[in-house]
């Protein structure tokens, strides 16, 4: 889960596994795989960082092939 802030200042969490895309229109808009959209105060870069941190925490990026590495060390 990642924490984000709505435009009205309300903080909530999203399951990062359901995030399909993050766009800036200029407000940051997060679209889920369900089609639900959230407009948040957080920058797209901050959301991307939180998504990566979440993936690392659940070891989703622990496979070197998923990370783009060709040879496992």
Q: Which positions does each model-derived feature cover?
A:
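Eukaryotic intrinsically disordered, low-complexity regulatory linkers and tails enriched in Ser/Thr/Pro
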Residues: 1-13, 17-73
């Amino acid at each position: 889960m990642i924490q984000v802030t709505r435009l009205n200042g309300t903080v909530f969490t999203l399951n990062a596994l359901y995030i399909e895309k993050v766009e800036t229109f200029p407000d940051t808009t997060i679209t889920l795989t369900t089609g639900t959209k959230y407009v948040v105060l957080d920058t797209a870069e901050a959301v991307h960082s939180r998504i990566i941190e979440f993936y690392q925490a659940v070891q989703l990026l622990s496979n070197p092939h998923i990370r783009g590495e060709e040879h496992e060390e």
